[in-house]
Amino acid sequence: MTAHIITGGGTGIGAATARLLADAGDDVVIVGRRAEPLLAVAATHERIHAITADAADGVAMADVVASTTERFGGVAGLVANAGGHGYSTVGSTTDDEWRSSLEANLTTAFVAIRAALDELERSRGAIVVVSSIAGLAAGPETAGYTVGKHALIGLVRSVARDYGRRGVRINALCPGWVRTPMSDEEMSVLVQRGDAPDVESAYALVTRDVPLGRAADAGEIAATIAFLLGPASTYVHGATIVADGGSTIVDVPTLAYG
């Protein structure tokens, strides 16, 4: 018996993934810095177990892996989903903001992967690193976030190159807009600026040029993560999987033509 570990498991994509995996019969350990949302998610399913820890803390993540292994016999998969903000231009980003953004968006994944690698080798397990389409292109005034998400793809490729022959699979997942509490906050910025009258209108605004015409539900992204962790994707390795409703296929200079 083994379990999956999900960082950033208290809300959004992490919480949706935990529920989906638990419903499928897997044990899941969710990790985050805030106990309250973790416990709320864990209360929804007997197979979801919460550990309060900072995914960027090497000692803390080593303890999470050790506790998971002791309780469940090993680690079957890791979802490196923790992330954070980094919303400013290079010129207006302070040193502290830069460090904080890279810690939240990149270091958390690096530390979690490093902590889990030995157990994942033993189980021949899989890793999914949740990046973003911000890992493929740059939005305005998002220097720290954009750089961190781009770097995650490099991290995935490095681990894939070094650990594939040791039995560990790893892939990057790049979602577009997903309805999560963090995205709701970003929609609220558009409402406050007067660009949209409410959050629903803001989502419509930011997805007006998305070929599917909408944001994803967190459960849709969770299903993609479950696929990448599972037996249906055993030859998918070192890949960057995009789940963005078609956003990144759009030829921006042709938008005026409809």
What are these regions (language model features)?
Residues 10-12:
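Conserved glycine-rich cofactor-binding loop
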Residues 79, 164, 169, 236-238:
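Short, small/polar-rich loop/turn modules that mediate ligand/substrate recognition or access, typified
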Residues 89-90, 97-102, 206:
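Substrate-binding pocket helix/loop in short-chain dehydrogenase/reductase
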Residues 110, 214-243, 248-249:
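C-terminal substrate-recognition "lid" of short-chain dehydrogenase/reductases
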Residues 113, 148, 156:
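Active-site helix of classical SDR
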Residues 118, 161-165, 234:
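Alpha-helical segment proximal to the catalytic Tyr-Lys
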Residues 132:
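Residue(s) in the substrate-gating loop at a strand-loop-helix junction
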